[in-house]
From Swiss-Prot:
Top-rank taxon: Bacteria
UniProt protein name: Large ribosomal subunit protein bL17
Keyword vocabulary terms for this entry: Ribonucleoprotein, Ribosomal protein
Similarity section: Belongs to the bacterial ribosomal protein bL17 family.
Disulphide-bonded residues: none
Listed GO CC annotations: cytosolic large ribosomal subunit
């Protein structure tokens, strides 16, 4: 019997799940919104919310714990420098999950998971800067 066994296995080994959640958390912190299946979104939400709470706590130990979970120091910096101050006055509930229909092909339920007060202008900012730099290079060489 599986009484009081929390969490979904998602048809993956423990190491695969751990790596997948680390990758999804990194992507969610980077883009502040991702589209995934509904069960994965429900599983990643408490992980990322605990990371934001670590960011709000600050301190060296909290930063090291976040690095161990995310494995990307750049995203940890964003977590501690950008997201933590944004949610300083909010006690939990940093993420929202919105159902997004069903995936074509296998009819899996999809969901959008995003930060509640996310910066809409930041989405794709890296791509816009890269494209703008390429256009400037073309303009100077022509």
């Amino acid at each position: 019997m599986r009484h009081s066994k929390s969490g979904r296995k998602l048809n993956r080994t423990a190491s695969h799940r751990k790596a997948m959640f680390a990758n999804m958390a990194t992507s969610l912190i980077e883009h502040e919104q991702i589209v995934t299946t509904l069960p994965k979104a429900k599983e990643i939400r408490p992980i990322v919310e605990k990371l934001v709470t670590l960011g709000k706590r600050g301190g060296l130990h909290a930063r090291r714990q976040a690095i161990a979970a995310l494995r990307d120091t750049g995203k940890v910096a964003k977590l501690f420098d950008t997201l933590a101050p944004r949610y300083a006055s909010r006690n939990g509930g940093y993420l929202r999950i919105m159902k997004a229909g069903f995936r074509t092909g296998d009819n899996a339920p999809m969901a959008v998971i995003e930060f509640v007060d996310r910066d809409v202008e930041a989405k794709g900012a890296g791509d816009r800067a890269r494209i703008e730099a390429l256009e400037n290079e073309k303009g100077t060489t022509s």
